[in-house]
């Protein structure tokens, strides 16, 4: 299934990022891996691959972002949950959109991807506050018209894929 998803993403020129499973990401030659604070260390991941690999790191505190900002192995931060989410069991406390702005004002320069309860009506403000991208699940999976919702999210976020 992962290979089918990877191939579909490549067909549309969209990076295929695997969440938390480093072995799977390397085995199927995914475009990237996203890990949390308590998952495989990013230095270990980078050392295990000899090909370009996008590495994302979950952040929900300023001190985590400051640590990650200094690690060359990290390509982007997943910031969240921004809003309450039902897609994850036992999510961390919500951060709110202003946390993105807080990170930017603190000098965080790596790309920030907002995740957690993000809906279409949030996208423009998140971008205004400094988010480089968004990650969604229910905004698409629970939409009445998946194609239209996906198109609207892409347009609002400035995505050209």
Locate predicted features.
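Charged helix-capping and loop-helix junction motifs
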Residues: 1-4, 92-101
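N-terminal active-site wall of soluble small-molecule enzyme domains
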Residues: 1-51
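Glycine-rich tight-turn/loop motif centered on a GG-T
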Residues: 10, 51, 85-94
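Glycine- and other small-residue-rich loops at beta-strand/loop junctions that grip anionic moieties
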Residues: 14, 34-35, 57, 92, ...
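Catalytic cores of alpha/beta
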Residues: 16-31, 60-73, 105-109, 113, ...
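Structural motif corresponding to alpha-helix initiation and N-cap regions
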Residues: 19, 39-42, 62, 97, ...
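Glycine-rich phosphate-binding active-site loops on the catalytic face of alpha/beta enzymes
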Residues: 35-45, 78-91, 123-153
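C-terminal alpha-helix
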Residues: 152-160
């Amino acid at each position: 299934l992962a290979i089918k998803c990877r191939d579909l993403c490549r067909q549309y020129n969209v990076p295929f990022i695997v969440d938390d499973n480093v072995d799977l990401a390397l085995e199927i030659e995914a475009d990237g891996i996203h890990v949390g604070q308590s998952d495989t260390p990013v230095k270990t991941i980078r050392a295990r691959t000899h090909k370009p690999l996008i590495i994302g790191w979950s952040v929900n505190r300023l001190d985590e972002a400051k640590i990650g900002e200094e690690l060359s192995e990290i390509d982007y931060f997943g910031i969240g949950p921004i809003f309450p989410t039902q897609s994850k069991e036992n999510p961390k406390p919500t951060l709110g959109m202003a946390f993105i702005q807080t990170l930017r004002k603190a000098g965080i320069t790596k790309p920030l991807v907002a995740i957690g309860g993000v809906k279409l009506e949030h996208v423009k403000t998140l971008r205004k506050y400094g988010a480089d991208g968004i990650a969604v699940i229910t905004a698409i999976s629970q939409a009445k018209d998946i194609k239209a919702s996906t198109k609207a999210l892409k347009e609002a976020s400035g995505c050209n894929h």
